[in-house]
Amino acid sequence: MRVYDAKVNHMTNPMGFFMDGVSFSWKVDEARGKAQKAARVRVAADEKMQEILFDSGMDEQADSLAYPVELALEPRTRYFWQVTVLSDAGEEADSEVQWFETSKMSEEWTGKWLTCDNTEKRHPIFSKEIAPAKEVAKARLYVTGLGLYEAYIDGKKVGDEYLTPYSNNYNRWVQYQTYDITDQIAGGGKLSILLGNGWYKGRFGFSAFEDKGYYGNEWKVIADVVLTYTDGTEEVIGTDESWTVTRSRIMFSNLYDGEQIDATAPELPAEEPTVCDAPKGRLEARRSLPVVAHEHIKPVELIHTPAGEQVFDMGQNFAGIFTFRVKEPAGTKIHIQTGEVLQKGDFYNENLRSAKSEYIYISDGNETVIRPHFTYYGY
């Protein structure tokens, strides 16, 4: 008998999610028996399951679809758990040890909400050098940015999610995400948070809101880096006036209209960030599941249309982004549009109405792999 697909609140090893309760679930196969007779759930403070915090004992009422357990959870804490299942044929099997890690919960933030000069259209990057004082046992980044954000350490993206912190009513609540950055920051490094417009800032909804943000018109960011050292002490580095603001080469981003990058744009002098008011919505641990790349699809055909266009046929309809390698002379403009059908053999996207659904890249002459950061396309 095998116990598998063990989840917490229907998620596998969730980190930093909002939890107003804890529920466990699991599946069983390869069993002689026809049904589960009982199950035992144990929760521990260690992966070896020796420091037991909760033990249900063999419970004949345990529901494998959702078994709620009352736990006094602590903020920023990883818990380990395991389920043992007894079948009606007398078989017994354990799941693999799983874990879940709590968010900041009600803990106060060290970081302050920061903004910058919002009249400059080039998308901002908020940065801070992180220099651990001792040997790092673990490191966590708690962060959100409005409208959208991507975090980097020494130029390498943190996590594999896109379009964070996702779409919700920002006037009511703003989600923050939690990342394990232990390996990336253990030796120190530069933490950078790139902001885009998204649903919060920029065109969203009906035409009355095209010239201003639906929820707000300021870029905003808040973050706490929590370094836990091997001696058990902690250091918290939050967003404050000591951070710096530089400008990316993203000139424009919008969920409807796409993104524009000018790699030839000159570097601008660093700016000082400004401490700003928090957004209207309460800052709360994430509820949205990660948006990640589930599949990489290659074009099945390059079509040369009667109008002289070059159209890549992806072979199916989907929502996503694209990546491509470019090496063109400096100043070369690459213009990509997306659509779902051809009309009379030519590219057609007038069904998108006013949405431009495009990507514009101006090359600086260097070979690079590029992708959109703060938009996605249906094509």
Model-derived features: where do they sit?
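Extracellular/oxidizing-compartment recognition motifs
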Residues: M1-R78, Q82-Y379
